[in-house]
C-alpha cells in the first residue's frame, strides 16, 4: 500500500536530528513563553488532533519550565509536618501548557496539544486553539461542538485529552 506525505513527516519526527532542533531551541528559549505560530511545526500531528488550515484555528507555542515544583524554604520558625517543600501538582506538563495558553488567549478555546521539543530546562508544546465566535467554526459540522457553552474553559476543567490522560481517565477500570 502506498504511503502518504503525512506518514513520512511523522517518520522524520520520530528521530529528529540535533541540527534540526538546536537553532530552534536557542530561539525559543530567548523568546516569550507564549507565541502565536503561523503554521504548526508538526503538521501530521496537528492534523491528527483536529487542526484545519482555515480561519478560526490558531496554533500557539508554549514554553513550560521542567523540573520539580518547589516552594521557597522557611527562613524562621518550625515547619509543620503537613507543610512540605515540594509541591505535588498531579498535572502533567502538557496540561499545564494548555492552561497557560487558555489564560493567555482568553477568547480562544483549547482543542488539543502536542510536544514539539524539550531540553534540560524547558518543554515546548504546540497548543491548537479555536475561536468559537468565528462563523467558519460555527458553520463547520465537525467543529461547531466547541461553540457550545458546555465546552467553555475546557482546559481549566480538565476536559482536554492531556488532562484526561493525567487524571487516569483514558481506560475504564473495574472498581469492585
Show which residues each predicted segment covers.
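Low-complexity, rRNA-contacting terminal tracts
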Residues: 1-55, 73, 77-176
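Active-site-flanking beta-strand signature of metal-NTP-handling nucleotidyl enzymes
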Residues: 58-62
Amino acid at each position: 500500500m502506498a504511503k502518504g506525505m503525512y506518514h513520512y513527516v511523522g517518520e522524520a519526527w520520530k528521530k529528529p536530528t540535533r541540527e534540526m532542533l538546536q537553532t530552534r531551541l536557542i530561539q525559543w528559549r530567548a523568546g516569550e513563553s507564549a507565541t502565536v505560530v503561523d503554521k504548526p511545526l508538526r503538521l501530521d500531528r496537528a492534523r491528527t488532533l483536529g487542526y484545519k488550515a482555515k480561519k478560526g484555528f490558531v496554533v500557539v507555542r508554549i514554553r513550560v519550565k521542567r523540573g520539580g515544583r518547589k516552594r521557597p524554604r522557611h527562613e524562621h520558625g518550625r515547619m509543620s509536618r503537613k507543610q512540605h517543600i515540594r509541591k505535588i501538582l498531579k498535572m502533567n506538563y502538557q496540561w499545564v501548557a494548555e492552561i497557560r495558553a487558555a489564560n493567555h488567549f482568553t477568547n480562544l478555546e483549547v482543542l488539543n496539544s502536542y510536544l514539539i521539543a524539550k531540553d534540560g530546562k524547558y518543554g515546548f508544546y504546540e497548543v491548537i486553539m479555536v475561536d468559537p465566535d468565528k462563523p467558519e467554526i460555527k458553520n463547520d459540522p465537525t467543529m461547531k461542538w466547541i461553540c457550545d457553552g458546555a465546552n467553555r474553559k475546557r482546559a481549566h476543567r480538565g476536559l482536554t485529552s492531556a488532562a484526561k490522560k493525567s487524571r487516569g481517565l483514558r481506560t475504564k477500570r473495574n472498581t469492585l
